[in-house]
């Protein structure tokens, strides 16, 4: 087993104050603050609870396109859900000291259909759009079996419409696969960071892949502009979509049940710390929102970002009414964590997280590869680099000066022995074997050099 994670000299961390907890003591890291802006087209109150209308169980996709054999969906009755994995064997390697709680993994890297966390929000929005369109066209009545969406009449209607998205990769896979399965014309605008294998996977599905030389932000802007000019095009806007965000939030419904099955209590004496990789912010914000709605203030969520792409940290620390980019701080936005290579955060997500988010930390690319190998060795789970971002969180929270100060300020230090640390992994199922081997080789080389 590789040695445990070294001190946080390779990481940076900041913690946000919680409105329902003690005021931070002087001398702490500067609090990150985010504020809503009218530049977001959708708004959502952190005190409201507009959870998705239906439980987020997708029971029809496996019937829609028989080119795909969704065995995992057959085993789960058509549901798209990931397991909750006990990871005690990983605790020491990740620097989680004895007596500081138990470590678990929420394994969204293995979600069926899209192979990443993006299956949650992406497929939710595609199905919501399809259902809305079918009702409008008289093909579906309220309460009717949604399997009519797989019938030829529905596919004929859907074929006249396009579903488009801008993506660095995983959201594009989610939208492209779901939309094409239903019969929509699908277009994915992909940034320069996108991996070639993800583009090829989409092309094999008949999805139009539009390549852009610029970054994620430019790909999204180009896709949005093109869709606005076409009345038959629906654009899934990763920066502004409330439907997408609420699709992610539904994960909390299933996690609550999984925690109960494992006998994991979440209350004042048993805090739950959740560590989520963050790109533009929609997925981790949606999950955080859902968890806080269902489990209350004893859930403490932290976002993990690449050192060169900390767009959410930049936004939360920015003055009111501004929307800065990581480039404004002299950062490069270059990272092997392609799904997290975002220069500017979603204002919708940032506004929602201002009163809910507990903290943000940054991770070096080398650390992602080291943790990827540690996860593989301890659990056998194969993840991509961006999915490894959250694993630095438990050691930073319980072992760094900033983390310990925050725990004491919240009165949580005395509750650590009963705490649960949940690292949310985000992608990896469909990564080609050659890519996995490259990831592993780089990680092992780094660990050997550090030994």
From Swiss-Prot:
Tell me the residues on which N6-(pyridoxal phosphate)lysine occurs. Answer: 118
Q: InterPro entries annotated for this entry?
A: D_Ser_am_lyase, Ser/Thr_Dehydratase, TrpB-like_PALP, TrpB-like_PALP_sf
Which keywords accompany this UniProt record? Lyase, Pyridoxal phosphate
Task: Output the Pfam families linked to this UniProt entry.
Answer: PALP
Can you tell which superkingdom this protein's organism belongs to? Bacteria
Family assignment?
A: Belongs to the serine/threonine dehydratase family. DsdA subfamily.
Q: What is this protein called?
A: Probable D-serine dehydratase
Q: Which gene underlies this protein?
A: dsdA
